[in-house]
């Protein structure tokens, strides 16, 4: 497996683009994006667990019932959520995109992100859909990634190549996500493309299994968005034998999927609103994977610990506190905690109790822009990893005037 450039355009037969259509006030910001497959593709998606769902979620769920899609369209600046005509507008987006590209509107993945509770006018979208389609190109992944950004400060794009059945395949993705990130079943907005041949059923299984260990293990602020969705299209143009069972080829595909989604998870967590550090919690020695996940997620969700990481304060007691209310079955008298970064590692807790350590060395480690909290439970062989970020003054500033 090899990391390559191209994002969602790395896979054969995929093109993408993004333009400004007028949803957002700033004319310098793209606010609508499109991804197109040359041929109909196997498709799957997972969605937010929030009971309040954006209208595009319902439309996409219906469109993907048959496991086939050929185009994805997404606007930013307006979530199209809690609007009386929301589903009608989302379906109109499908029709407009389908007409422009000559594609069945029922084969369109539609998404929106932005402010909740504001009507989304179809007029600017209708007026610019032709221009959006004209902007789609074979190297347009970056423009598409820009078009789905809201409070993001970094573009999130990744791709890999891998070999299945002797054929070189490609899998790439773009994502948006900076705030309201605390998913369950899906997260933020993620668009994945692949040229491997895989059945809709196996693609759905691969994605559903994958998000449990990747996107479901990310949290920035504890808020679960109304519009979270991860979607994938696989068009088969790599020419490999169809993956229709859990065989060796399926395992290779899943490994490539995990490589891409894990990279996107780290990008999303590192770009948390106002964040200055990527916070990763690695839990090992757990009785079960479930306990390991509960423990890791609890640690990266702790506001007190996130604030301590921002201040480069080695307050390991906040780690134990988070473990204690995590719901995981642990024996605190066996727990070890260490902090780790590019400049080194330091043990700060052994067997659930304090030990002597250099505060200066700990601070040096915690001042790096990527920090790991390593928790060893000494109770079994299961492990899990979760990703988050520190909590800074800027998070409040950004969300205090989000609508203005």
Task: Place the predicted regions along the sequence by residue.
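A structural signal for small-residue-enriched, beta-sheet-centric alpha/beta enzyme cores
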Residues: 1-88, 92, 98-404
């Amino acid at each position: 497996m090899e990391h390559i450039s191209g994002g969602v355009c790395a896979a054969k037969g995929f093109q993408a683009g993004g333009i400004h259509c007028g949803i957002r006030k700033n004319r310098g910001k793209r606010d609508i994006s499109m991804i197109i497959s040359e041929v109909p593709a196997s498709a799957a998606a997972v969605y937010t667990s929030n009971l309040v769902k954006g209208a595009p979620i319902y439309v996409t769920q219906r469109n993907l019932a048959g496991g086939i899609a050929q185009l994805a369209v997404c606007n930013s600046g307006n979530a199209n959520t809690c609007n009386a005509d929301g589903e009608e507008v989302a379906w109109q987006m499908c029709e407009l995109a389908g007409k422009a590209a000559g594609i069945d509107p029922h084969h369109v993945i539609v998404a929106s992100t932005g402010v909740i509770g504001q009507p989304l006018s179809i007029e600017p979208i209708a007026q610019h859909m032709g221009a959006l389609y004209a902007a789609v190109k074979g190297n347009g992944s970056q423009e598409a990634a820009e078009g789905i950004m809201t409070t993001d400060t970094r573009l999130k794009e990744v791709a890999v190549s891998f070999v299945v059945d002797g054929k070189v395949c490609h899998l790439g993705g773009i994502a948006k996500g900076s705030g309201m990130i605390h998913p369950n079943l899906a997260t933020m907005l993620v668009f994945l493309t692949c040229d491997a041949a895989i059945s809709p059923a196996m693609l759905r299984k691969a994605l559903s299994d994958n998000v449990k260990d990747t996107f479901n293990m990310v949290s920035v602020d504890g808020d679960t968005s109304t519009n979270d969705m991860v979607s994938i299209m696989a068009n088969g143009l790599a020419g490999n034998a169809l993956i229709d069972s859990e065989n060796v080829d399926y395992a290779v595909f899943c490994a490539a999927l995990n490589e891409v989604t894990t990279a996107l998870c780290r990008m999303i967590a590192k770009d948390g609103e106002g964040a200055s550090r990527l916070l990763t919690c690695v839990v090992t020695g757990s009785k079960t994977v479930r306990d390991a996940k509960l423990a890791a997620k609890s640690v990266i969700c702790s506001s007190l610990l996130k604030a301590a990481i921002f201040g480069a304060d080695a307050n390991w007691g906040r780690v134990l506190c988070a473990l204690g209310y995590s719901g995981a079955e642990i024996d605190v008298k066996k727990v070890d905690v260490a902090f780790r970064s590019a400049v080194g590692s330091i043990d700060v807790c052994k067997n659930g109790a304090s030990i002597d350590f250099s505060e200066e060395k700990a601070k040096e480690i915690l001042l790096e822009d990527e920090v790991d909290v390593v928790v060893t439970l000494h109770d079994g062989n299961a492990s899990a990893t979760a990703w988050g970020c520190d909590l800074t003054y800027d998070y409040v500033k950004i969300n205090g005037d989000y609508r203005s």
